[in-house]
């Protein structure tokens, strides 16, 4: 019995407390610029979950949380570059087809569809290495090929020179008879 109570005391930071703090009206998100120098760890709270509250570092040390459950150490921290995967700004009087093509190009560039397909199934380490190797090969082949430039400029000049030489040649039979 004593061992279970000491275990419960040790794991108490993982369980919500019975004392309820007044719920905040809007969720609180950490500032991405101050994540490294942050004094307090912040939990996301809403009216639906009254037992989720802001926890001070002095109350529950972060080192203990990282040791007990490392995957949950930064579970409440949100990392993102922007609010959207792809963002296309619409110009005034822009054609719908052009807008749709720009959106499709941005989605392909961001790799949103490929990421969705990849996340659909579990991928072990070997499959992940294969996928990354394939993606790197695609990127490198695109770099090697470069953009399509059409016919080579040297070829056009060579054909023009041949036409001038053909004009100087006379393969017609002379009007007179053969001398022999």
From Swiss-Prot:
List the subcellular locations: Plastid, Chloroplast
Broad class of where this protein is predominantly found: plastid
Q: Which terms in the GO cellular component ontology are assigned?
A: chloroplast; ribonucleoprotein complex; ribosome
Q: Name one GO biological process term.
A: translation
Which spans does this entry mark as compositional bias, Low complexity?
Answer: 14-45
For molecular function, the Gene Ontology terms on record are: rRNA binding; structural constituent of ribosome
Q: Which family does it belong to?
A: Belongs to the bacterial ribosomal protein bS21 family.
**Quaternary structure and interacting proteins, as annotated:** Component of the chloroplast small ribosomal subunit (SSU). Mature 70S chloroplast ribosomes of higher plants consist of a small (30S) and a large (50S) subunit. The 30S small subunit contains 1 molecule of ribosomal RNA (16S rRNA) and 24 different proteins. The 50S large subunit contains 3 rRNA molecules (23S, 5S and 4.5S rRNA) and 33 different proteins. bS21c binds directly to 16S ribosomal RNA.
Report what the protein is called.
Small ribosomal subunit protein bS21c
């Amino acid at each position: 019995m004593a061992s279970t109570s000491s275990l419960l005391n040790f794991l108490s930071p993982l369980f919500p407390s019975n004392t309820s703090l007044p719920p905040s009206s809007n969720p609180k998100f950490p500032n991405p610029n101050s994540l490294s120098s942050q004094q307090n760890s912040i939990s996301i709270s809403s009216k639906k979950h009254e037992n989720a509250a802001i926890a001070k570092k002095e109350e529950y040390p972060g080192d203990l949380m990282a040791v007990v459950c490392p995957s949950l150490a930064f579970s409440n921290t949100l990392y993102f570059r922007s609010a959207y995967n792809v963002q296309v700004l619409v110009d005034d009087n822009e054609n719908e087809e052009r807008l749709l093509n720009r959106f499709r190009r941005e989605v392909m560039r961001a790799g949103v569809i490929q990421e969705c397909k990849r996340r659909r199934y579990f991928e072990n380490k070997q499959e992940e290495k294969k996928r990354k190797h394939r993606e790197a090969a695609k990127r490198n082949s695109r770099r090697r090929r470069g953009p399509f430039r059409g016919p080579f400029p040297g070829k056009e000049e060579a054909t023009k020179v041949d036409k001038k030489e053909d004009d100087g040649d006379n393969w017609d039979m002379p009007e007179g008879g053969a001398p022999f």
